[in-house]
Amino acid sequence: MNWLTNVVRPKIRNILRRETPENLWIKCPDSGQLVFYKDVEANQFVIPGSNYHMRMGASARLKSMFDNETWFDVALPEVTPDPLKFRDERRYADRIKDARARTGMNDAVKVGFGKLEGMGVVIAVQDFDFMGGSLGMAAGEAIVRGLELAVEKKSPFIVFAASGGARMQEGILSLMQMPRTTVAVQMLREARLPYIVVQTNPTTGGVTASYAMLGDVHIAEPGALIGFAGARVIEQTIREKLPEGFQRAEYLLDHGMVDMVVHRHDLRPTLARLCRLLTKAPAVEHAKPAPQLPPPAKPAETAEAPAVATSA
């Protein structure tokens, strides 16, 4: 003990270390900027400074689309969880179990039915956090069930695609979901109901070879990666350097592969407007402000009449 400790007594520090949440801050992949997670979440997972569109979970996506943030979760058919008893470095069944615990979802696709600016719509969302949004038996069943429900309800069907492709652990059973979903889309088309695809980052592989490229209208989020094979694979195959921005949403818009690139904040009114146009529904009449009444007239000031002199 020295003279300093005699003057300033050491304080007892907290033995338990204060835990800091891992996702308290987010680093923007585009600018490298550190952003508070709550700010990004409140901004629909768009980085405020750089406008970079982060990946958005299925529940958050549905919440941002439906009126009053309410909808009905559509019950999806049960499938065999591990039909091939697949195993690589880990068992496929264990990977599914971990993905379910991490995301709270049964599989990569979530389907909801609700109101979009007063119009009934069915929306299916792929969650990339669930095994890369890969298309397996359960995801295929979810898409087909969503399309069937849209026909039953006579409502538009909207899908938010986000996937790395078919799920390799399910083999040919996964690839079979491509023609199955294609047939289901044709069923919706025969019912003359709108089918709108929103391609988010990334939309690749077997998904782009099936239902993600069959929409009546294709919308892409800014900067989304959209394509079948990866750019590196294409370059190695054709032995040529690909142009700048190849397979990005803006490049595909310039070359006619998508109809529009829409900021996430503008998606909801854009989708509602498209659904009304394609179903020939009347436009929503927004409540007009009450006409302002003119201010009441001020009462006229009464002046005393001047006295008139009379002669005697």
UniProtKB/Swiss-Prot annotation:
Stretches with biased composition (Low complexity): 299-312
Domain CoA carboxyltransferase N-terminal: 24-293
Catalytic reactions of this protein: N(6)-carboxybiotinyl-L-lysyl-[protein] + acetyl-CoA = N(6)-biotinyl-L-lysyl-[protein] + malonyl-CoA
Keyword check for Manganese: no
Record's keyword annotation contains Lipid biosynthesis: yes
Gene3D superfamilies xrefs: 2-enoyl-CoA Hydratase, Chain A, domain 1
Region (Disordered) location: 286-312
Main location per the UniProt record: cytoplasm
Broadest EC class assigned to this enzyme: transferase
The enzyme's E.C. designation: 2.1.3.15
InterPro entries per record: AcCoA_carboxyl_beta, Acetyl_CoA_COase_Trfase_b_su, ClpP/crotonase-like_dom_sf, COA_CT_N
Matching Pfam families: Carboxyl_trans
Cellular component annotations (GO), alphabetically ordered: acetate CoA-transferase complex
Gene Ontology terms describing biological process: fatty acid biosynthetic process; malonyl-CoA biosynthetic process
Pathway(s) of this molecule: Lipid metabolism; malonyl-CoA biosynthesis; malonyl-CoA from acetyl-CoA: step 1/1
Domain of life: Bacteria
Keywords: ATP-binding, Cytoplasm, Fatty acid biosynthesis, Fatty acid metabolism, Lipid biosynthesis, Lipid metabolism, Nucleotide-binding, Transferase
Single GO MF annotation: carboxyl- or carbamoyltransferase activity
Subcellular location as annotated: Cytoplasm
Similarity annotation: Belongs to the AccD/PCCB family.
Assembly and binders: Acetyl-CoA carboxylase is a heterohexamer composed of biotin carboxyl carrier protein (AccB), biotin carboxylase (AccC) and two subunits each of ACCase subunit alpha (AccA) and ACCase subunit beta (AccD).
Chain's role: Component of the acetyl coenzyme A carboxylase (ACC) complex. Biotin carboxylase (BC) catalyzes the carboxylation of biotin on its carrier protein (BCCP) and then the CO(2) group is transferred by the transcarboxylase to acetyl-CoA to form malonyl-CoA.
Record's protein name: Acetyl-coenzyme A carboxylase carboxyl transferase subunit beta
Organism: Bradyrhizobium sp. (strain ORS 278)
Name of the gene this protein is made from: accD
